[in-house]
UniProtKB/Swiss-Prot annotation:
Protein name (database record): Large ribosomal subunit protein uL14
GO MF annotations, alphabetized: large ribosomal subunit rRNA binding; structural constituent of ribosome
Database matches in InterPro entries: Ribosomal_uL14, Ribosomal_uL14_bac-type, Ribosomal_uL14_CS, Ribosomal_uL14_sf
Keyword check for rRNA-binding: yes
PROSITE patterns listed in its UniProt record: RIBOSOMAL_L14
Residues spanning the membrane: none
Gene3D superfamilies for the chain: Ribosomal protein L14
Family: Belongs to the universal ribosomal protein uL14 family.
Species of the source: Bartonella henselae (strain ATCC 49882 / DSM 28221 / CCUG 30454 / Houston 1) (Rochalimaea henselae)
């Protein structure tokens, strides 16, 4: 459950380390984002020679949340922290690698490129 002002780790090699959610996309009154949702983020911490700089405003896909995700079979999956992958306007990842596991729910949201780059799909 990601809302405005939430800090997230970046799970790709785009150059950003930490980002902060500044808007949840998908409706004027929408308050929360979950796995697979697109948010607008501000880069708060970045490595020196990365593709993005501190202060850049980007779009990102939420790939991990500390709030548990309920599945149709009754099982629950949750992660240790919140993480996102930076994407461009065509919803393609900016980085070329994804770090850490990602949930299967991204497939239903048509984020196939993120699924294919991820080392582990839970």
């Amino acid at each position: 459950m990601i809302q405005m002002q939430t800090n997230l780790d970046v799970a790709d090699n785009s150059g950003a380390r930490r980002v902060m959610c500044i808007k949840v996309l998908g409706g004027s009154k929408r308050k929360y984002a979950s796995v697979g949702d697109i948010i607008v983020v501000s880069v708060k911490d970045a490595i020196p020679r990365g593709r993005v700089k501190k202060g850049d405003v980007m779009k990102a896909v939420v790939v991990r949340t500390a709030k548990d995700i309920r599945r149709a079979d009754g099982s629950v999956i949750r992660f240790d922290g919140n993480a996102a992958v930076l994407v461009d306007n065509k919803k393609e990842p900016i980085g070329t690698r994804i770090f850490g596991p990602v949930p299967r729910e991204l497939r239903a949201r048509n984020h196939m490129k993120i699924i294919s780059l991820a080392p582990e799909v839970l």
